[in-house]
């Protein structure tokens, strides 16, 4: 049973509970996230998502990283730009976190193209 919980992001485990028990807080949090992206400052969407890719790589939030990579791709970021954002993590946060982030990126790209990414 411990192995099962080791492989699940705690955010995923608690999100349903939180949204059911604190719906108005969650809605306000979602609204804040939307406003930060639209009105928070001069950064365009591509740059915002690249920053989020780097942050979630550094924090090892795999579920968030997967979401941020997909949103970066949909905002027009290239595979190379996303990979660069992940590579920038190594000097500050370590090589293992970067390797984990690259694996998640490669997995997403492989899933979307059904081809091996090298």
Predicted feature locations:
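Alpha-helix boundary/capping and short turn/kink residues
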Residues: 23, 41, 63, 78, ...
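A generic alpha-helix surface/boundary motif
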Residues: 27-32, 49, 63-67, 83
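Mid-chain, well-packed structural core segment of small domains
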Residues: 57-87
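Short alpha-helical linear motifs
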Residues: 70-77, 93, 105-113
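C-terminal structural segments of small proteins and small subunits
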Residues: 83-106
């Amino acid at each position: 049973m411990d192995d099962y919980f080791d492989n699940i992001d705690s955010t995923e485990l608690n999100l349903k509970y939180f949204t059911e028990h604190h719906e108005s807080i969650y809605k306000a949090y979602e609204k804040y996230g939307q406003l930060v992206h639209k009105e928070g400052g001069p950064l365009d969407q591509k740059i915002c998502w690249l920053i989020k890719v780097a942050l979630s790589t550094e924090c090892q939030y795999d579920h968030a990283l997967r979401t941020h990579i997909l949103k970066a791709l949909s905002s027009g970021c290239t595979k190379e730009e996303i990979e660069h954002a992940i590579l920038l993590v190594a000097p500050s946060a370590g090589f293992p976190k970067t390797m984990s982030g690259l694996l998640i990126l490669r997995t997403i790209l492989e899933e979307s193209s059904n081809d091996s990414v090298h």
